[in-house]
Regions:
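Short, surface-exposed coil-to-beta transition loops
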Residues: 10-12, 67-72, 94-99
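Short beta-strand micro-motifs in enzyme catalytic cores
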Residues: 11, 56-58, 98, 109
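Hydrophobic ligand-binding cavity/cleft-lining segments
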Residues: 1-51
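Beta-strand/loop substructures that line and gate deep hydrophobic ligand-binding cavities in soluble
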Residues: 87-141, 158-160
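Glycine-rich portal/gate segments that line the openings of hydrophobic small-molecule binding cavities
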Residues: 32-33, 44-91, 142, 146-162
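A short, structured loop/turn motif at beta-sheet edges
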Residues: 18-22, 75-81, 101-110
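A structural signal for well-ordered alpha-helical segments within the folded catalytic domains
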Residues: 22, 138-141, 145
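Amphipathic/hydrophobic helical signal segments and adjacent flexible N-terminal regions
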Residues: 1, 162-163
Length: 163
């Protein structure tokens, strides 16, 4: 058995969103995300309700040099608390824990989003090395702009986000 210290990177970011936690929370879902995130298209979703719920599983296409689709598992889904936790396994690359905590903050809410990526091998080492605070900040600002556009207009912001 090999036991080794993890090669891991974790970053958090607080988004300022124009919707209330009750408006935002349902959009944190593999199905509903396609409404506001241009290009989001899961390969498959397993859900009794048809949307995010505890034990929902979904696949996203291989990306970033990965050879297999990523497997996502919703471990906690607490609408009343504005909290969701998901695990994402990209075989041969990374294991990721994603947490999102929504908190009411006028005029909408704040979303504290944390991604923690742990390498599972050489491909994961490369991913973790590139998962910098700068990269994460850019990713979060784009997500924030797209979510706010959807919350304000009800439409998906297509193409690149200016900044």
């Amino acid at each position: 058995m090999k036991i080794a210290p993890p090669n891991r990177a974790s970053h958090s970011y607080v988004q300022k969103l124009v919707g209330s936690p009750a408006e935002v929370f349902p959009l944190l879902c593999p199905v509903r995300e396609a409404e506001w995130l241009d290009g989001w298209d899961p390969v498959a979703v397993w859900s009794r309700s048809g949307v995010a719920e505890p034990d929902c599983v979904f696949l996203t296409p291989a990306s970033g040099g990965a050879s297999q689709d990523a497997i996502w598992y919703v471990t906690r889904h607490e609408p009343g608390n504005g909290f969701v936790e998901m695990l994402k396994i990209t075989p041969g690359a990374t294991a990721c824990r994603l947490t999102i905590q929504l908190t009411a903050a006028a005029p909408g809410c704040e979303a504290e989003i944390t991604y923690t990526h742990t390498s599972l091998g050489p491909a994961g080492d490369r991913f973790v090395a590139g998962f910098t605070a700068e990269h994460y900040g850019e990713f979060m600002r784009e997500w924030e702009a797209r979510m706010n556009h959807f919350l304000a207009t009800g439409t998906c912001l297509r193409g690149e986000v200016g900044g």
